[in-house]
Amino acid sequence: MPTSTAAFPLIRAHLPLALALGAAALVAAAPARAMLHYEGIAYAADGKQVLYRESHWVREDGARLVLYQCTNGAAFARKRVDDGSAAPDFELVDARNGYREGVRRSGSGREMFSQAKGQAERRAPLPKSTEAQVIDAGFDAYLRQRWDSLGSGGPQRIAFVLPSELRTLDFRITPGPADAEVQRYTLSLAAWYGTLLPDLSVAYTRQDRRLREFRGVGNIRDARGRYPSVRIEFPERLRGQADAGAWEQALQQPLVAQCSAR
């Protein structure tokens, strides 16, 4: 949710649900069985312009590999998510600006880290929280786990981990409009300054609880280093199966330092 305000200077912080909505300790080899593969298309929030694409591979154990691709198909960033829990270790690397961030094991605990190109790595212990802690794509797992209680009760609060700021922010999840096919949820900051920031919204299919759309500030910076508002669609037609070879190819795929025109 990277919006700069005088009242809250660290609104560079963002909510990476775009998601599905990378990890240092990830096992590199994928199993031989087929795995889920799907794609997302990120549009500018105010129009039909395609900004980038996401290609997701999800193993049976919930581990996830994501390539972020230019409009010409070249990959510029990669994310590895350790497992399918609500608070997994992960690592995101963007070759365009040399930025990296994530959460990893450290000694007997865990730590957040981030690093801008040419700068020293910043790190801090993962803070404790009285709220349910959610990390990166773990938001998807959280929604699936709490689906029934979210639908029947009031808003729920989560502590979302923001490695870019080395802290957490409390968010409120509120069920939105629903119909026979789609359930929507709205995420807003659970603080007095929450009205200063735009809400995030996600839409899930009710039948199989599949993410269909994300609207809000994304987790991928633009050419100016800002986090733009995006609308990411996850079409059913771009959903299928892949084998272990596809995982390995995505893991070894070179990342470009600049997106060129088509």
Features from the language model and the residues they span:
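Bacterial N-terminal signal peptides that target proteins for export
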Residues: 2-18
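Short, extreme N-terminal leader segments that mark the start of a protein/domain
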Residues: 30-41
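Generic surface-pattern signal
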Residues: 16, 144, 148, 152, ...
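Acidic, serine/threonine-rich low-complexity disordered tracts
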Residues: 35-37, 46-64, 68-86, 91-98, ...
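N-terminal signal peptide c-region/cleavage motif recognized by signal peptidases
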Residues: 23-29
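Surface-exposed beta-loop interaction hotspot
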Residues: 117-165
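An exposed acidic His-Trp-rich patch
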Residues: 97-126, 226
